[in-house]
Amino acid sequence: MTIAKDYRTIYRNQIKKQIRLNQEHLQSLTHLGSQINFEVDPPKLPDPDPARKVFFFDIDNTLYRKSTKVQLLMQQSLSNFFKYELGFDDDEAERLIESYYQEYGLSVKGLIKNKQIDDVLQYNTFIDDSLPLQDYLKPDWKLRELLINLKKKKLGKFDKLWLFTNSYKNHAIRCVKILGIADLFDGITYCHYDRPIEEEFICKPDPKFFETAKLQSGLSSFANAWFIDDNESNVRSALSMGMGHVIHLIEDYQYESENIVTKDHKNKQQFSILKDILEIPLIMDVEVYRPSSIAIKEMEELEEEGEAVNWSNQQINVQSS
């Protein structure tokens, strides 16, 4: 046995062991919100309702904080896969991971496009299914309270809370179960790692994936949707699709004078920048102020990218609650 094959065998055995531990943990969950109440793959699409309001939630680095370090765990998992399964050295693995993410929105899409893998579901097993999420995430009761209130009149009275993720369903559902919020969502739009390699693989920020989420949730008009994501490309795509309120979650964002930036976009859309998902109640009702230098910079950057921007700038004080 060569050294390379020996390392690969050790790597695969470690993956198998961790997946077994992950499955045992998932099956042991009994806390509030650890079970889903929706059908993951319903047999038919719901009828669109013109009055329906839907809030779309990204999962990774959104429903849990980036500072949990799950992203670093994912990056290490990706790096190991590129090294031990695909045979790249550390530098080349790092370069390809970043390059594919920037160009395609997901590293796996780059691997598919460049014919470097032939089994996407196996890739998912090595990457997301093997993550020891239970060592990094725990039930978030404040987040649970927020989600419950979003369906109440005082916080927008959304008809549906919808998971919208570039991950496969296994990882997505495991995350929300551990967080204790699985029972609060009405459905999920996820990337189909389980489809044949020759089929088109779509993910955010592809507009077709947004249309898929619209159909699956029964949303009639994007104007009736709210969307939150930590990825700038996904946020820009949501704005271009006409979503009613788009939130860019930037955990290390520096508010100017402790103000949250909320701005009116074209076609009565609104765009907000938040540091924490728990700040959502603060942008439900906003008062108009003069634009901050940060807001102006954001507008200029969007205009340079070709966005048709017609803002009236709004901010609210973080301490107002």
Swiss-Prot record:
Cystine pairs: none
Gene3D superfamilies xrefs: 1.10.150.450, HAD superfamily/HAD-like
Superkingdom to which the source organism belongs: Eukaryota
Alphabetized GO MF terms: lysophosphatidic acid phosphatase activity; nucleotidase activity
Any one GO biological process: cellular response to phosphate starvation
GO cellular component, one term: cytoplasm
One Pfam assignment: Hydrolase
Induction: By low phosphate level.
Coiled coil feature spans: none
Family indicated by similarity: Belongs to the SSM1 family.
Further details from the record: Present with 195 molecules/cell in log phase SD medium.
Function: May be involved in phosphate metabolism.
Matching NCBIfam families: HAD-SF-IA-v3, Pyr-5-nucltdase
Protein name: Phosphate metabolism protein 8
Organism: Saccharomyces cerevisiae (strain ATCC 204508 / S288c)
Lineage, uppermost ranks: Eukaryota, Fungi, Dikarya, Ascomycota, Saccharomycotina
Chain's gene name: PHM8
